[in-house]
Amino acid sequence: MSTAPGVIKLLGEHAVVYGKLSIAAAITLYAHAYSTKRGSDFAIKLKDFGKEVKLTSEELDNIYASYNKKKSFEEYAKLGYGVALPYATIASIMARNSSLDGLEIEISSDIPVQKGYASSAACSLAFALELAKQIGANIDSKILEVAREGDKVIHKSEGAGKIDINTSFYGGIVSYSSEMGARKENIDVHLNIFIVDTGPKKSTAETVGHVRELYEKDRQGTERILNEIDACSRKGIELLKTGDKRGFGEIMYRNQELLNMLGVSSEGLELVVKKAKENNLLGAKLSGGGGGGIAIVLADDDAETKVFSDLGFEVKKVSIDYEGAK
């Protein structure tokens, strides 16, 4: 069995698209991949979707060829296989040097989907890791790149999964920028993290596109906001290293104000942040693409977050997973 944790964005989302620093954390919600030997073909079983796909070696070859000659992810999706296509893509890459015949990989997850937890990255990574173990492949950076191919297919974007896959793999708190790449920070701090689900969210592609439009209309003004988000990320790392939770929470509040200025917040997210401030909680902000979905809240005590459940929001308490995928 292989597991990979979900991921939340502590600071810096959206700005990371423009080369700025982003901070993410692996959390104690997991995707799982189990393997069994059965039959003659390779099989992918998606437990949460009630779907199973069997693939011959010839079909895997065709998927691999189609992926490499695709003109767009939208065109590639027409190949078929539905929600199994990302995993079939990963398998087709790993089948280049090893036979997958007779192997079945089942994927399940306790990470909510389409909320901002990087569930797709965790599922792709757990699947790739379990395949690697079964065929005797090295567990190294190449596996991360293969797992990213699955996340790219899910999000239909070449840029998908860079920080999510790395954070899920390494665990703990990971910083990322396009210039630096991913780096696991030497931080071991206990944070009481509460995830508040504000409801449906816009797709990440939609909110990223909105910021792109804003950037094209007012490059100077938008760049100023993005630079301040970058400064929040850099200051936030230093505060976490010293264990200054109150200071880090204030940075979260400021980061949220800047994200709202970019137009990627929502009425529900703003309500959560407002109530967090009114109740003197340490910090709160959206996590991920925004436009709805989850807010992350730092609090000293569980009872302090009752205000959110009283508003009708679902609240989950999570911790940082420092072990990463395994």
Regions found by a protein language model. Give the residues of each.
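Short pre-catalytic strand/loop immediately N-terminal to key active-site residues, enriched for Gly-Thr
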Residues: S109-K115, L282-A284
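C-terminal nucleotide
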Residues: M1-K9, A15-V16, A24, H32-A88, ...
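DPxDG-like acidic metal-binding loop motif
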Residues: L29, Y117-D140
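Glycine-rich active-site/cofactor-binding loop and its immediate structural neighborhood
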Residues: G292
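Short, glycine/charge-rich beta-strand/loop segments that flank catalytic centers
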Residues: E104-I111, E145-E149
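A glycine-rich phosphate/pyrophosphate-binding beta-strand-loop-alpha-helix module
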Residues: E75, I105, K115
